[in-house]
């Protein structure tokens, strides 16, 4: 998650090799990283920015605590997978957004990506294909599962399965799902207001829904009605080609 990461853009000599840059960054690490270097996982990349001094370049430094990376790698190992790359969430969103950008209506410049995960909801605002704002809230699909669990006397696992299979009593839509959807709208509206109050923007052009809870029935429609912006569910397969063998 972006909140667990430190990013810093620093100037360095253009003629340095990557090995030399790494040595220099590690020597100067205390300036940029507020925890011991042996507890850090860090990486860097030379940015394509053109500086006034052609002998200097901007270098993006990214660091997080090593335990943050190891915890996620261990989860993958339990699933029989091996992690090859650890990326920052906001950078991943920028890369993924390139897939959707061409599918949006003409004139759409400022897009809010509302990612509703299991425990966290993140609003990332895109402007010219770059993330210009991110806000995370501790709220997600887990709350809906817990409401199902409490309402119908199920275990958490049973509630999760019932939510996915939509095998719930007739009063579910009114008594449980409806209030949850309203809570999602409130969270989204609050995040947007924080964005507007901290920037020169007072509106966005479009909202893309993403995450494991993006396809909850009625969510996109309710967000569009309440917030006043067009809302669509992000579909990464919309422009993807398939092999004739599939």
Language model: regions and residue ranges:
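Adenine-nucleotide phosphate-binding core of ATP-dependent small-molecule kinases
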Residues: 90, 151, 158-206, 213
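Glycine-rich phosphate-binding loops at beta-strand->alpha-helix junctions
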Residues: 177-180, 202-232, 236-238
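Conserved, well-folded catalytic cores of nucleic-acid-processing
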Residues: 32-36, 78-79, 100-103, 151-154, ...
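Small-residue (GG/TT-enriched) beta-loop-alpha framework at ligand/catalytic clefts
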Residues: 54-161, 184
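Active-site neighborhood for divalent-cation/phosphate handling
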Residues: 2-101, 206, 233-243
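Active-site phosphate/pyrophosphate- and oxyanion-stabilizing loops and adjacent acidic/basic residues
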Residues: 27, 146, 221
């Amino acid at each position: 998650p972006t909140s667990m990461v430190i990013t810093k853009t620093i100037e360095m000599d253009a003629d340095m090799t990557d090995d030399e840059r790494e040595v220099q960054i590690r020597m100067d690490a205390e300036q940029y990283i507020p925890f011991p270097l042996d507890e850090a996982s860090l990486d860097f990349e030379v940015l394509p920015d053109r500086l006034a001094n052609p002998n200097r370049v901007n270098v993006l430094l990214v660091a997080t605590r090593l335990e943050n990376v190891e915890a996620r790698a261990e989860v993958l190992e339990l699933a029989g997978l091996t992690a090859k790359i650890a990326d920052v969430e906001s950078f991943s969103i920028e890369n993924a957004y390139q897939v959707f950008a061409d599918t949006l209506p003409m004139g759409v410049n400022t897009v809010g990506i509302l990612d509703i995960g299991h425990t966290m909801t993140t609003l990332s605002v895109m402007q010219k294909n770059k993330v210009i704002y991110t806000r995370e809230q501790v709220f997600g699909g887990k709350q809906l599962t817990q409401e199902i669990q409490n309402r119908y006397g199920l275990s958490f696992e049973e509630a999760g399965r019932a939510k996915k299979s939509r095998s719930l009593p007739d009063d579910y839509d009114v008594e449980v799902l409806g209030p949850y959807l309203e809570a999602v709208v409130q969270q989204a509206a609050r995040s947007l207001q924080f964005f507007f109050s901290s920037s020169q923007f007072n509106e966005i052009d479009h909202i893309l829904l993403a995450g494991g809870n993006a396809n909850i029935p009625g969510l996109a429609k309710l967000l569009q009605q309440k917030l006043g912006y067009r809302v669509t569910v992000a579909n990464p397969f919309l422009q993807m080609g398939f092999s004739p063998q599939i």
